[in-house]
From Swiss-Prot:
CDD domains: CIMS_C_terminal_like, CIMS_N_terminal_like. L-homocysteine binds at I428, G429, S430, E481, D596. Belongs to the vitamin-B12 independent methionine synthase family. This is 5-methyltetrahydropteroyltriglutamate--homocysteine methyltransferase. The gene is metE.
Length: 757
């Protein structure tokens, strides 16, 4: 029985890629030096896979920024405004991802969206009338040859043409038909080139197959591959799917001339039933995704073996991961502070390679010692249940999820209490974390800085931040979040039920890596988490200062959750803990409390029919539970970013927040039309500039954004803010950008323009 994975993390076990890229962006290293780091990371990945017994090591899973963006470059799908910059290929890629600004040019970054239901983000391809497909697969081919030279016969992977078409933005009435023929031709060229190099396999990733499909989309997929697979010659082609099942198209797909088909048996609820009902062709390999590529818990071998048995008499099975391992940390080897007893329960990417091999060995060779060891791990009670918390959740009633008075009724109380101007200006929460701030936090964690000295340092930084905001002229201030390393980890560290790693980093986008905390047991709040800093900040100014919290859904979605209880139960535990914090903030005199739900959409099922019953029916009430007990005059804000929200607008309105800020600038404010169409009741702050790009927007640019918003929404409904928190930016970008934001807002206010609503 062969052993395989879909892809391996590319960031390095110590985030080597992140740090090399940041040096390159600062012009501290050359492209050649950056490429050396990349080559070392690829070699390490292939070695790890081979040493673990993986039969099909993967190439072309490496990317400097994003694999979808790599494909756009390979296909020549580069909008004209980026070509005009006349940059080399790598810098063009970075311009698409980050924007580009110099004395002569000012180009915004392409929109960034969540990769299906993960916390990874992809750069959205843009198709226009000017788009001309021009194949250049040098990256894939070079990395395949690089591996071969190093002694590894790899299976290159690439995102497929169907998924590319589904994910792309189409401008000016253009449809996929405009590029379909050339797109198929480009992949045909890749087949020929890989054949000429002696390539054995090509993995084509088509995760869009697990989404709801129209009849037209099913036919589009079939049309693409009936044509494409005619040209594979000796090359064997694996269709790799993940994040769900193929219930719309399984019967048709197994008829196509693929040599292997990869199915997800972790998130694909119907995958086993599909194989049982319709069978699996004897002339194809079934790449069975049975090792969870998204979570960090050890595989339960008994359950996996039982699942494989349920597939029936299929001889041609390859043990595989359920998705790319880029969604989990690289290895547990660097975790020196967690006990062996705890680490035994975890499998990061390198450990999952071993799991793939062990499952194969147990299945084929009946290795009972490996199986017995795994069974013993799951036979123990890992945590003790909190009975009191369980009872509290059981006895929640409908009233616990409803805030009174209603949204419209309490708005008058808030207007009176806050006395804000039209178009109130604010930020999303965090301010730039300078090397000095990071150094002090690290010194405090290491015991090199006393608590009193560290707190005095933070108070000074908060004062500076408040003074800066007042000088700029913002209406609602924030304390800057200098005490926080991460918007989820910070809270998890103060909640019972969480455990933390040292180096369990996962890529979110580009150079942005996150270290998700792990939900180990039942979650409770032993003491106040943020009141100390929010209350201090409010005492330093007469302007309102927002209390800043992360919401329960986002905390869970950006953690590695338990697998022994439901996501709903874990979320309600978190909601009760955050509710306690909200009430303590209110008691301390904080009048505006922001409860971020940046990741609300992240666990939304990929199929619309499952949205409510499996997610929204408990995720939205969990948010309402958090703020249901606050006073009418306390204003509740929330923030959301980097997802598609247009199709769940009614659910977002049902969160019953008073103000919601959205990421909107990269997506050309497209969410505004949806808000207007759904008669959105909540006050809104669509982000007027993109903070994930280093470029600085002008006052005029922000004014134009505001005018677009006010052409569709009443001025009384609109707040003015950036897209997201400013933590990852520098002061040299933040200060002028916010200054321009306030200047533009004042100009619009002064103009007293009558807008067509």
């Amino acid at each position: 029985m062969k052993k395989s994975i879909i892809a391996f993390p590319r960031i390095g076990s110590n985030r080597e890629l992140k740090f090399a890229l940041e040096k390159y962006f600062r012009k501290e290293i050359s492209e050649d030096e950056l490429q050396i780091v990349a080559k070392e990371l690829r070699l390490e990945s292939w070695k790890s896979q081979k040493e673990a017994g993986i039969d099909y090591p993967i190439s072309n899973d490496f990317s400097f920024y994003d694999q979808t963006l790599d494909l756009s470059i390979a296909l020549g799908v580069i909008p004209e405004r980026y070509k005009k910059l006349k940059l080399n290929e790598l810098d063009t890629l970075f311009a698409l991802a980050r924007g580009f600004q110099d004395e002569e040019n000012d180009v915004k970054a392409r929109p960034m969206k969540k990769w299906f239901n993960t916390n990874y983000h992809y750069i959205v391809p843009e198709i226009s009338k000017e788009t001309v497909i021009k194949a250049n697969f040098s990256k894939l081919l070079n990395e395949y040859q690089e591996a071969k030279t190093a002694g590894f016969e790899t299976r290159p992977t690439i995102i497929g043409p169907y998924t590319f078409l589904i994910l792309a933005d189409y401008l000016s009435g253009v449809t996929e038909d405009a590029i379909l023929s050339d797109l198929i031709g480009a992949y045909t060229i890749l087949f020929d080139q890989l054949n000429n190099l002696g390539g054995e396999w090509l993995q084509i990733e088509e995760p869009a197959l697990v989404l709801d499909q129209t009849e037209e989309e099913q036919q589009l997929f079939i049309k693409i591959y009936q044509e494409l697979l005619k040209n594979k010659n000796k090359l064997r082609v694996l269709l790799q799917t993940y994040f769900g099942d193929l219930r719309n198209s399984y019967q048709e797909i197994i008829k196509l001339d693929f040599d292997g088909i990869g199915l997800d048996f972790v998130e694909g609820r119907e995958s086993v039933k599909l194989v049982q009902k319709y069978g699996f062709p004897k002339n194809k390999l079934l790449f069975a995704g049975v090792v969870n590529g998204k979570n960090i818990w050890r595989n339960h071998y008994q359950k996996t073996l039982s699942l494989l048995k349920d597939l029936g008499n299929i001889d041609n099975i390859v043990i595989n991961t359920s998705c790319s391992l880029q969604h989990v940390p690289v290895t547990t080897e660097n975790e020196t502070k967690l006990s062996k007893e705890i680490l035994n329960h975890f499998a990061f990417a390198k450990e999952k390679l071993v799991e793939v091999s062990e499952i194969s060995e147990i299945y084929v060779k009946k290795n009972t010692s490996l199986l017995d060891k795994n069974i013993a791990l799951f036979d123990k009670n890992r945590v003790q249940e909190n009975i009191q918390l369980k009872q509290k959740i059981i006895h929640l009633t409908d009233k616990d999820f409803i805030r009174t008075p209603s949204l419209v009724e309490r708005r008058a109380d808030q207007i009176k209490a806050l006395n804000l101007p039209l178009l109130p200006t604010t930020t999303i929460g965090s301010f730039p974390q300078t090397p000095e701030i990071r150094k002090s936090r690290l010194q405090y964690k290491r015991g090199e800085l006393s608590k009193s000295d560290y707190e005095a340092f933070l108070e000074e930084k908060i004062k500076e931040c408040l003074e800066l905001q007042e000088n700029i002229g913002l209406d609602v201030l924030v304390h800057g979040e200098f005490e926080r390393n991460d918007m989820v980890e910070y809270f998890g560290e103060q909640l019972d039920g969480y455990i933390f790693t040292q180096k369990a980093w996962v890529q979110s986008y580009g150079t942005r890596c996150v270290k998700p905390p792990i939900v180990w047991g039942d979650i409770t709040r032993p003491q106040a988490m943020t009141v100390r800093w929010s209350a201090y900040a409010q005492s330093q100014t007469s302007k309102p200062v927002k209390g800043m919290l992360t919401g329960p859904v986002t905390i869970l979605n950006w953690s590695f959750p338990r697998e022994d209880i439901s996501l709903k139960e874990s979320t309600l535990q978190l909601a009760l803990a955050v509710q306690e914090e909200v009430l303590d903030l209110e008691k301390s005199g904080v009048k505006i409390i922001q409860i971020d739900e940046a990741a609300l959409r992240e666990k939304l099922p990929l199929r619309r029919s499952d949205w409510y019953s499996e997610y929204l029916d408990w995720a939205i009430p969990a948010f309402r539970l958090v703020h249901s007990k606050v006073k009418a005059e306390t204003q509740i804000h929330t923030h959301m970013c980097y997802s598609e929200f247009e199709d769940i607008i009614p659910s977002i309105d049902a969160m019953d927040a008073d103000v919601i800020s959205f990421e909107a600038s990269r997506s050309q404010l497209s969410i505004i039309d949806a808000l207007k169409a759904h008669h959105f009741q909540t006050l809104v702050g669509p982000g007027v500039y993109d903070i994930h790009s280093p470029r600085i927007p002008s006052s005029q640019e922000i004014k134009i954004q505001l005018e677009k918003i006010l052409n569709k929404l009443p001025i009384e409904q609109v707040w003015v803010n950036p897209d997201c928190g400013l933590k990852t930016r520098g002061n040299k970008e933040t200060i002028p950008s916010l200054t321009h934001l306030v200047e533009a807002t004042k100009e619009v206010r002064k103009g007293k323009i009558t807008y067509d609503k």
